[in-house]
Design a protein with these regions (language model features):
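Non-catalytic cap/lid and distal C-terminal segments of serine-dependent acyl enzymes
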Residues: 32-356
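Positively charged n-region of N-terminal signal peptides that target proteins for export
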Residues: 1-5
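Bacterial N-terminal signal peptides
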Residues: 8-20
Length: 356
């Protein structure tokens, strides 16, 4: 099998794994590798309390997400239509995709229990001027690669001057329990891995120059990848100011010394107890997301965790947009297909666009 075909297989598997397997049901999955870094697994859940259900019952009544909506809480669904920006258009410049592999055996941070090859796919817009630092998106699980989804969106929205001329770095996760180690660990380790190992290789392999300006850097992911996106910006705010998350795993999935309740620390302690950081966030959760009927006290209800995080962001005065998806599941593809262009436009609001 040649490397390009292998790249496509790996990318499709990664996207299917997150957008399909994890979307199947409301029961919380076992933490890959166990909670607390490998010392446990799924714990039995308690049913949601009347108070929990009353909080969740408010979400379907949120105002509909309209074009150009600002900060706040919104809803979409129950019916969905793919955004026209996903379709490839004729008569506009089309960017290119460059793919390469990184061997885990050469990594100082994530060598893997078993060596593996990590696919890295890079979108470079046709309008990119060599040598000029480009703003960029860093996405988990190769999000946006399948069917050139993100490439088409960026082609169209850059041409329409709705987004700046930007690159996208779509990186596959490590296999098996490696994914949870990388994404669910609440620490700066993964962000530093990206900065010191992935991004230098991207510049070397593609010739693109990536901006160092945190205003020009966005992280993007779903499920554990959504938690990773926020973790990168939280711990390395000097590098990232923009975050986009679908069904973010802001729950007690992988505990650590600095986060005894895993990513649930974000709504529970990190955001409430710290000064406001210059982070702009778009976040989503679905009606039938993981743990939607479990007790908030278990810290394993994705709906309540995201709802509470949104509440804290509002109280602290963050620029954020929280979207509740009716008739949808975990990292539901129909939600992404409808909302991603508008989410990108919100996250990149106020960033300079040439010619606008």
């Amino acid at each position: 099998m040649n490397r390009r075909l292998l790249a496509s297989v790996i990318a499709c598997f990664a996207i299917a794994s997150v957008g399909g397997i994890l979307a199947q049901g409301p029961a919380a999955p076992a933490a890959p590798g166990g909670r607390g870094g490998g010392k446990g697994g799924q714990r039995p859940g308690n049913p949601a309390t009347p108070e929990d259900l009353a909080d969740i019952a408010k979400l379907p009544n949120l105002p509909a997400l309209g074009q150009g909506a600002g900060d706040g809480d919104f809803s979409v669904g129950p019916d969905y239509t793919p955004a026209p920006e996903e379709k490839q258009r004729v008569g506009i410049p089309h960017g290119k995709l460059i793919e390469f592999f990184m061997s885990s055996s050469s990594s100082k941070v994530f060598p893997g229990d078993t060596p593996f090859e990590r696919l890295v796919s890079v979108y470079i817009p046709a309008q990119y001027v060599p040598g000029r630092p480009a703003p960029f998106i860093f996405s988990a699980d190769s999000y946006g690669l399948q069917g050139r989804q993100l490439a088409n969106i960026l082609d169209n929205m850059i041409a329409d001057r709705r987004l700046p001329v930007m690159a996208a770095v779509m990186t596959a996760n490590g296999p098996g329990p490696e994914r949870s180690l990388e994404y669910d660990t609440v620490s700066p380790v993964f962000a530093d891995f990206v900065e010191n190992e992935i991004l230098p290789r991207v510049e070397k392999e593609t010739g693109v120059t990536l901006t160092k300006d945190p205003e020009g850097r966005m992280t993007y992911g779903g499920s554990s990848g959504g938690a990773m996106a926020l973790t990168m910006a939280w711990y390395r705010t000097e590098r990232y100011h923009r975050v986009l998350s679908y069904s973010g795993t802001f729950v007690d999935l992988r505990e650590g010394p600095g986060a005894p309740h895993g990513a649930y620390e974000y709504p529970e302690h990190f955001f409430p107890d710290n000064p406001v950081k210059p982070i702009r966030i778009w976040m989503h959760v679905s009606e039938n997301d993981i743990g939607a009927t479990s007790a908030s006290a278990d810290r394993r209800n994705w709906v309540i965790a995201n709802q509470r995080l949104a509440g804290v962001l509002k109280a602290k005065g963050y620029h954020y947009q929280f979207v509740y998806a009716k008739n949808a599941g975990h990292v539901d593809s129909k939600v992404i297909h409808q909302t991603l262009p508008q989410a990108l436009e919100y996250v990149w609001k106020d960033y300079p666009i040439s010619g606008k």
